[in-house]
């Protein structure tokens, strides 16, 4: 089937007035290849040309004023080809001096007693406006587009095309296209939405702020609705082929394993285990997200599930994003399982004969549980009968990587784990219909980490506090944002310089260095020394953000903490507080922005990762929270997942009803269904 368009035009781009081969090249750089693309190329913002009352105008604000010229314009030249034109206006009985730099031609256009409209920066003290645009009344020649356009669309453009040109070309296109409605009359009436025709025309040429708000609301809902139709349809297709073998685990053996654990499970852990076990008994494949705050005990839950698979005769796989984390998981699971399970580690560092033997053992089921990095998804990694695939910190992998691991078993159950609690909005968008288990309870005996914020000039006091902890036999992390100094970020501390400074302070043998440029063997050596308490202080970049577990570490200093988002800061902080000893986290930062100050304040107020994830999403937006490409989120033109989260839930419910009821597959939705199928359904946002 050919590509289905919801916007159809009788013309090609080349047939539009003002578009030739050179313009086509520029438009293609803007990803505009068809008339439909042009119509859907929406403004990034709007310039407000509404004339303002000067009595209400704030000093140094950008304003639009209208007044009568009462002195002839005067031009003064200075420097090399520079000029300054001065003219005086009477604006509602207020004498205003207008200055235009490097626009001497305006002298011939502005006449005495003429009414003109000026846009520029207002100086309240001097009663002066520095103009950047001027509109003349109907008696004069207009130097810009008509000032009657109160809201002027502004587009992202490139060299070779001007704002006026793209506005004119979009206006031409809108006059001739046929726009098929994306929403039914019933949906539009139910949620008081506009037609797509009105919406697109208004987004490009708004007549009022009220119209623009209505159009943006309609388009935002439409984007979210189409996205959710795609998600719900994919879920339907996935579940239709989601038969699974029932995992007939030995409950008595599992209970015995839990009883042998050196600690008692929290109620949240027990609840999560029960939810996962119910999924394993179900006739369809499990798709579950296990989310829990740092140190909440997700790995133990995963271990119990792996053990259950072993009792049923199946293998398990655990994929993590880094080698350090893979090694730590392997160590902790081997300690938990003892001789009851054969655990193996496969990373990029495992090569040659060792790798060959491991793969043979995996295929003949000598290995019960395989832990590794993306090396697990390589073609030569063949399981005998894998029944459970676990992906830790799953948002750090692309959708395709996760799918490849899942396909290692024909009827494999899938468990995703994350220590970055997912805000509800993103959970709906990224994980769709996936079931979610949450561990919001920390193990008994854990004390909340005391977090404080210090300015750079208080560094010596922080150092004294860290030294006090070291004297108690504890260990400490020191985190920096950069590996080496940068000429672009001269005021940001780098890990190498701080490492050398602390070596001088504490002695060379007591301080270790960890960063991403070290080889896997070098990282492993440093981490082993820190884990074995051969070094007291580990100076590191964010490579320790996830998973590193050293219970004796009770102090963390994060240098230039304002350079990190809330979720990253919280993950870093989670490296301490992993025992019954009191732990401390000190944020060293002198933020210059309100956002930076707010982040530091929030971090000192709460240690709740779920609350922090919501605040982080509000401050950074969904694109930065995961990274759009990593998360599978589309880049919406109008919709905002933070601001429009209620609308997202409504769109999701409506899409789910259409798909699940089967109404979407009736003739009424034929055009929209073909559009979603041909343009969205199998599109990857990775």
UniProtKB/Swiss-Prot annotation:
One of its GO terms (biological process) is DNA recombination. GO terms for molecular function: ATP binding; ATP hydrolysis activity; DNA binding; DNA helicase activity. Keywords: ATP-binding, DNA damage, DNA recombination, DNA repair, DNA-binding, Helicase, Hydrolase, Isomerase, Nucleotide-binding. InterPro entries: ATP-dep_DNA_helicase_RecG, DEAD/DEAH_box_helicase_dom, Helicase_ATP-bd, Helicase_C-like, NA-bd_OB-fold, P-loop_NTPase, RecG/Mfd, RecG_dom3_C. A motif (DEAH box) lies at residues 392-395. Residues 462-618 form the Helicase C-terminal domain. It is an enzyme of class 5 (isomerase). Residues 279-439 form the Helicase ATP-binding domain. It comes from the Bacteria. Gene3D superfamilies: Nucleic acid-binding proteins, P-loop containing nucleotide triphosphate hydrolases. ATP binds at residues 292-299. It catalyses: Couples ATP hydrolysis with the unwinding of duplex DNA by translocating in the 3'-5' direction; ATP + H2O = ADP + phosphate + H(+). Residues 50-149 are annotated as: Wedge domain. Its EC number is 5.6.2.4. Monomer. Belongs to the helicase family. RecG subfamily. The wedge domain within the N-terminus inserts into the replication fork junction, where the lagging and leading strand split. Plays a critical role in recombination and DNA repair. Helps process Holliday junction intermediates to mature products by catalyzing branch migration. Has replication fork regression activity, unwinds stalled or blocked replication forks to make a HJ that can be resolved. Has a DNA unwinding activity characteristic of a DNA helicase with 3'-5' polarity. This is ATP-dependent DNA helicase RecG. It comes from Staphylococcus aureus (strain MRSA252).
């Amino acid at each position: 089937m050919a590509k289905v368009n919801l916007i159809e035009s009788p013309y090609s781009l080349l047939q539009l007035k003002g578009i030739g081969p050179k313009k086509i090249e520029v438009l293609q750089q803007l990803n505009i290849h068809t008339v439909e693309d042009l119509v859907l190329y929406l403004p990034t913002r709007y310039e407000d040309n509404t004339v303002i009352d000067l009595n209400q105008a704030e000093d140094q604000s950008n304003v639009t004023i209208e007044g009568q010229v009462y002195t002839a314009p005067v031009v003064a030249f200075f420097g090399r080809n520079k000029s300054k034109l001065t003219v005086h206006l009477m604006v509602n009985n207020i004498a205003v001096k207008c200055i235009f730099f490097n626009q001497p031609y305006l002298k011939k256009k502005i006449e005495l007693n003429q009414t003109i409209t000026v846009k520029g920066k207002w100086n309240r003290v001097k009663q002066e406006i520095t103009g950047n645009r001027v509109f003349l009344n109907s008696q004069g020649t207009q130097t810009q587009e008509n000032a009657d356009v109160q809201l002027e669309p502004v587009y992202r453009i490139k060299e070779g095309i001007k704002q006026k040109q793209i506005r004119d070309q979009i206006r031409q296109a809108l006059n001739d296209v046929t726009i098929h409605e994306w929403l039914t009359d019933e949906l539009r009436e139910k949620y008081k939405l506009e037609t797509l025709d009105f919406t697109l025309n208004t987004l490009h040429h708004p007549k009022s702020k009220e119209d623009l708000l209505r159009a943006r609301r309609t388009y935002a809902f439409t984007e979210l609705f189409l996205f959710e139709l795609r998600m719900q349809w994919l879920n339907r297709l996935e579940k239709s082929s989601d038969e699974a073998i029932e995992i007939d685990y030995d409950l008595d053996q599992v209970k015995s394993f839990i009883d042998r654990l050196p600690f008692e499970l929290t109620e949240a852990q027990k609840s999560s285990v029960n939810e996962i076990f119910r999924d394993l008994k179900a006739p369809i494949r499990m798709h579950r997200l296990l989310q829990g705050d740092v140190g909440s005990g997700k790995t133990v839950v995963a271990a119990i599930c792996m053990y259950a698979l072993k009792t049923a005769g199946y293998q398990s796989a655990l994929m993590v994003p880094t080698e350090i984390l893979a090694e730590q998981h392997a160590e902790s699971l081997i300690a938990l399982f003892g001789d009851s399970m054969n655990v193996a580690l496969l990373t990029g560092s495992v090569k040659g004969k060792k790798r060959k033997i491991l793969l043979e053992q995996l295929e003949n089921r000598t290995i019960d549980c395989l832990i590794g990095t993306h090396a697990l998804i390589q073609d030569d990694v063949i399981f005998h009968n894998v029944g459970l695939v676990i992906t830790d910190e799953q948002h750090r992998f692309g959708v395709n990587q996760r799918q490849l691991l899942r396909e290692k078993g024909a009827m494999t159950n899938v468990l995703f784990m994350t220590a970055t609690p997912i805000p509800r909005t993103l959970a709906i968008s990224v994980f769709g219909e996936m079931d979610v288990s949450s561990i919001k309870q920390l193990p008994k005996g854990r004390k909340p980490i005391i977090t404080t914020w210090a300015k750079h000039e208080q560094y010596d006091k922080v150092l004294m506090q860290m030294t006090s902890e070291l004297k108690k036999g504890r260990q400490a992390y020191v985190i920096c944002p950069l590996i080496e100094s940068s000429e672009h970020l001269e005021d940001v501390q780098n890990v190498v310089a701080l490492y050398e400074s602390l070596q001088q302070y504490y002695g060379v043998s007591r301080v270790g260095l960890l960063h991403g440029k070290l080889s896997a063997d070098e990282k492993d050596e440093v981490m082993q020394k820190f884990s074995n308490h051969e070094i007291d202080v580990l100076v590191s970049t964010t490579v320790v953000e996830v998973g590193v577990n050293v219970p004796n570490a009770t102090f963390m200093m994060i240098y230039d903490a304002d350079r990190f988002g809330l979720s990253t800061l919280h993950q870093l902080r989670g490296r301490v507080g992993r025992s019954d000893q009191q732990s401390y986290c000190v944020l060293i930062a002198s933020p210059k922005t309100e956002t930076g100050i707010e982040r530091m304040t929030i971090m000192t107020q709460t240690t709740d990762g779920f609350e922090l994830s919501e605040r982080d999403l509000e401050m950074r937006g969904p694109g930065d929270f995961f990274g759009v490409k990593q998360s599978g989120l589309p880049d919406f033109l109008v919709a905002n997942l933070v601001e429009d989260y209620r609308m997202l839930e409504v769109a999701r419910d409506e899409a789910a009803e259409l798909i699940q009821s089967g109404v979407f597959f009736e003739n009424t939705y034929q055009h929209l269904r073909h559009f979603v199928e041909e343009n969205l359904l199998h599109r990857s946002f990775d």
